[in-house]
Amino acid sequence: MTQSAETVLPPRRVLFVHAHPDDEVISTGVTMASYAARPDTHVTLVTCTLGEVGEVLVPELINLRSDLGDQLGGYRIGELDRSCAELGVTDHRFLGGAGRWRDSGMIDTPANDDPRCLWRADLDEASAALVQVVREVRPQVLVTYDENGAYGHPDHIRAHDVSVRAFADAANPDFAPEAGQPWQISKFYETATPKSFVQAGIEYFRESGGESPFGPAESADDIPLAVPDELITTEIQADEYLPAKVAAMRAHRTQMAVDGFFFALADGIGKRAWAAEHFVLTRGERGPGTEPGAHETDLFAGLPL
């Protein structure tokens, strides 16, 4: 969905930039659902690729794989549509249009060398594509990954890089003037998984005997994506939207097995923990009155809205 020039958007607007279909729900599902449910808030999701190189967990759909029929990207558009419907998100776009940049695959795989992939994208062009969305929607808040892409996936890293560039470029009147009037985003957040959450997961899988997504690690200190709890600036706790997050996860059936670790982890460490999502504010000012060691509870905290 693209907003027309006549569209009057709500006063609070947040832009989420994710790499592939399904990423939107894993780290930001309850956050997106909770804001999408508010009449005063507009949620925009930009997905950078179709996820063409992802795995296929449904046996009867195995021929969709990139090394076989190479039809997975188109199929995942439908999965993403269903996920957004579960989350209540009505404004979703693909960066540069569907299929402009291809899934780059995991690091150090042949897919990284495909000239069509996001990892090889010209940063000016990719930023211009995101700037066009920013200047149209005029979000006060942007949410994406950290500079390591959370767990090092090339597309997550590139989504971060593009977002950082667009954060600056959107406010620059000399950059892509054809993309609309300059707009300054007020707050830039990066998704984060607290060490305490990772440690709880490690201990759960060790005690239950299940296959751990954290491998043989005994401590969250050994997991690169685990962020020290004291660095977390913001926590969105939205228990009532956990069912929407779970339903959105199930919409991505080629990627998430119903007996997979995401659902096992939710059962193991407690659903309330799974309904909390965490962020680090890296650009902009924290909301006033946030005591040392305390978290913001609203991405818009401190903004004059």
Swiss-Prot record:
Keyword Hydrolase set for record: yes
Feature: compositional bias, Basic and acidic residues: 284-298
Positions of disulphide bridges: none
Binding site for Zn(2+): 20, 23, 156
Alphabetical GO biological process terms: mycothiol biosynthetic process
SUPFAM superfamilies: LmbE-like (SSF102588)
Chain spans, region Disordered: 284-305
Co-factor(s): Zn(2+)
Catalysed reaction, written as an equation: 1D-myo-inositol 2-acetamido-2-deoxy-alpha-D-glucopyranoside + H2O = 1D-myo-inositol 2-amino-2-deoxy-alpha-D-glucopyranoside + acetate
Species annotation: Parafrankia sp. (strain EAN1pec)
Cofactor annotation comment: Binds 1 zinc ion per subunit.
GO terms for MF: N-acetylglucosaminylinositol deacetylase activity; zinc ion binding
Protein name according to UniProt: 1D-myo-inositol 2-acetamido-2-deoxy-alpha-D-glucopyranoside deacetylase
EC number: 3.5.1.103
Keyword line: Hydrolase, Metal-binding, Zinc
Recorded family membership: Belongs to the MshB deacetylase family.
Function: Catalyzes the deacetylation of 1D-myo-inositol 2-acetamido-2-deoxy-alpha-D-glucopyranoside (GlcNAc-Ins) in the mycothiol biosynthesis pathway.
